[in-house]
């Protein structure tokens, strides 16, 4: 038949996709809901306090266990007031997360980042520490990748000592696509460092994103299926400890 080769190729492609879906069904996944964080792109107006509460209550109705509830800055945001009300209401904070920078400024690694400081004052315990590994604003010959690893270790220790010994600490590889393209060795060095920490010191997990819109889902998927996910699953995931 003239279409035998085409039919065979289509069948093989479908079989590969079915294998991927079968693997997904067996993975022990968590959902970290990010609905409360406001978008910085295409948003006409900010959230009100009432908006925050409505979103939070709807997310809880969905049954999601892990929820991101804030992103802080030096200015007072709606997030600050919302978190104060949330904690004062007696809400369980053990599975609530908030974003924080890893450093206060490029040339200031000593000051506790405002995100961590606000988490301490508001009573949150689970930080998502955001890092960039391919940015030019850092002189990587002066502040080396080993310095970044050391700083992450210090932030993790601070969080467990100051926020809670049971803190579920996440590290977000914020510029993951650019790091994979331009600074793959630096990226793997950091991930390998985090994964090689003793079980009691490791982060709860790693996050990564594609915030630029420059890369197709297939590209990010290929990276996810590669070395980075090996490190994440084998070393870092809390589910294996």
Language-model-detected regions and their locations in the chain:
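Alpha/beta enzyme core
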Residues: 2-5, 38-66, 85, 89, ...
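N-terminal amphipathic alpha-helix/helix-capping segment at the start of soluble metabolic enzymes
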Residues: 2-45
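Short linear motifs at secondary-structure transitions and domain/linker junctions
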Residues: 4-10, 72-75, 183
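A short helix-to-beta-strand connector/capping loop
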Residues: 27, 92-94, 201-203
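Terminal or standalone catalytic/regulatory effector modules within metabolic enzymes
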Residues: 54, 64-77, 81
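Short catalytic-loop micro-motif centered on adjacent basic/acidic residues
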Residues: 67-70, 98, 241
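N-terminal active-site wall of soluble small-molecule enzyme domains
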Residues: 73-99, 103-115
């Amino acid at each position: 038949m003239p279409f035998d080769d085409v039919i065979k190729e289509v069948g093989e492609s479908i079989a590969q996709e079915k294998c991927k879906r079968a693997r997904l069904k067996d993975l022990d996944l968590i959902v970290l809901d990010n609905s409360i964080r406001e978008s910085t792109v295409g948003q006409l107006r900010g959230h009100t306090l009432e908006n925050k509460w409505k979103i939070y209550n709807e997310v809880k109705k969905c049954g999601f266990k892990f929820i991101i509830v804030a992103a802080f800055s030096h200015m007072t945001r709606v997030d600050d007031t919302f978190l104060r009300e949330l904690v004062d209401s007696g809400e369980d904070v053990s599975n609530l997360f908030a974003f924080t920078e890893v450093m206060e400024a490029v040339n200031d690694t000593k000051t506790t980042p405002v995100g961590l400081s606000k988490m301490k004052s508001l009573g949150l315990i689970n930080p998502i520490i955001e890092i960039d590994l391919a940015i030019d604003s850092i002189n990587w010959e002066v502040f080396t990748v080993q310095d970044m690893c050391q700083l992450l270790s210090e932030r993790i220790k601070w969080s467990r000592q100051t926020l809670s010994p049971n803190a579920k600490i996440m590290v977000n590889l914020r510029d993951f696509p650019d790091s994979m393209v331009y600074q793959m060795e630096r990226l793997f060095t950091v991930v390998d460092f985090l994964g090689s920490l003793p079980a009691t010191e490791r982060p709860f997990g790693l996050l990564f994103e594609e915030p630029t819109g420059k890369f197709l889902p297939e590209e990010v998927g290929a990276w996810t299926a590669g070395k980075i996910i090996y490190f994440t699953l084998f070393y870092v995931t809390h589910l294996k400890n």
